[in-house]
């Protein structure tokens, strides 16, 4: 049986603790969040599903510390949204941790399954718990470019590719 504590909302993603791994995810409109733990990279179904109730919710953050987990474990999330009048049927979707430092499952990943509403545990990407302290930031310094001289482009592809000459079928 897996033991979980309340955990902390920060840092986001997964982080090693003295007792296991802390998970934190932003899910503003969630009714609950599930952490799916996979035995190995190629697992098509989770070995454990940990449902986080409101005790693991602080504002928009959902968090839990799972005891006895180590670096290298494979995980993902599922989010059940509150009933907001929109029938999206995505609570079965396996979601990659947006703050993950390691991603696996590219060999079995199928984008078309990610876009459908049915369950996609057999073809999803999985996050990998990595030790944050091992990355040497000194070897990869920030670019020596001032923010005043930085140009950030934002493009909305729907409107960028939409034209009067485009034919939609």
What residues fall within each predicted segment?
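Conserved, mostly hydrophobic/aromatic
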Residues: 25, 77, 155
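Beta-strand signatures of extracellular beta-sandwich domains
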Residues: 34-36, 76
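Solvent-exposed serine/threonine-rich low-complexity stretches and specific carbohydrate-binding patches
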Residues: 46-56
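The feature marks proteins involved in alpha-glucan
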Residues: 1-18, 57-61, 68-152, 163-168
